[in-house]
């Protein structure tokens, strides 16, 4: 009888071990995620962190013309060559300054830069009558002049782009900085940007 009881005990132990092993195998298969459509913690971890899909853009406008419309003659070489008035909104809170580049991508010899302004205060909302706030400065344009030069296409209708950049820090540039250095610094790592485009035809 004693031997019979030992045999029975061993049988129960074997069944118990098989039950535990089966449970472990089922748990392992369920946690692998293969073909699973659940949305538990394992699925969330695999998805990774959520990142913004795009950076907010700055809205640029001019009281002188609408986006895609003709730029008035008075702002060109055929007029008084007055700097075009601009306004903008949407500069992010973390910006330390604002920069502006006006250029013509249709110029015969490649993009021609008409105007470069940098280190405008982050709180600035535009440029009116060409007046720059304290601290702001101009870099050289395509003519080598640290000033505005208006639209003056040799032939046809050209696009003139006014791009505003929100900068993470004040740029280490001097007034009258060379054009290539200024463009590189402005475009290096802006927080956001926005653009207004106008048209001007040769006379």
Where do the PLM segments sit?
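N-terminus-centered regions that define maturation/targeting leaders and the start
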Residues: 2-6, 16-203
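Twin-arginine (Tat) signal peptide motif
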Residues: 10-11
